[in-house]
Each structure stands twice: as structure tokens, then as C-alpha cells.
Amino acid sequence: MDVKYKKSDKSLTVYVYGELDECSASVAKNILDKLLSENLKAKRVVFDLSGISFMDSTGIGLLIGRYKKLKELKIPSFITGANFSTEKVIELAGLYSIMPKI
């Protein structure tokens, strides 16, 4: 699992690579929380999941946790780039209802 990011004037795009599951969730959580805390002036955060090879319910929980933190700060969050299998997990969990797909 790896995380990279790109900042612009208005948004922070977070690129997540590899597997997002029980084994990688705690590492991903620490990386994402640090990254988000360093970029509190972003107007929006986009999670680019095009590099995800596998995601389970632990990955969904991780994204929901980041959504809640960002919602408290009034920063909208979005998802983009999910492959077919990741998209199915996201749809089944109803995640797009709180983190829209762009």
C-alpha cells in the first residue's frame, strides 16, 4: 500500500495504491490522517482509487473515517478512478451517497 498526493489551489488529490484491507488499514490510516492534518486549507479532497488492486470492508471503513473527519472541518470529499471490483464494493456499501463519484 502506498499513498501519494497532489495539491492545487483548491483541492488535495490523494492517490492510493495497492491493497486497502485489514493488513494495510492501520498504516493507511496513519498516512492519510497526517496528510489531511497538514492540508486543512484544502477546499475539497479527492481520493483517487485508480491504483487500488483490492479493497474490502476495512477499506470502506477507512474511507468513512476520513469522510467524517473532513465533514467536521466542512471539507467535502469525493472518490474517483475506482476500478470495476473496487467500484462494486463502494456501491454495495453505499459510499457514493456520502462521498460522490467524480
Question: What are these model-predicted stretches?
Answer:
Residues 1-2, 102:
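Absolute protein N-terminus
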Residues 4-30:
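STAS-typified acidic loop motif
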Residues 22-99:
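Amphipathic alpha-helical interaction surfaces in cytosolic regulatory modules
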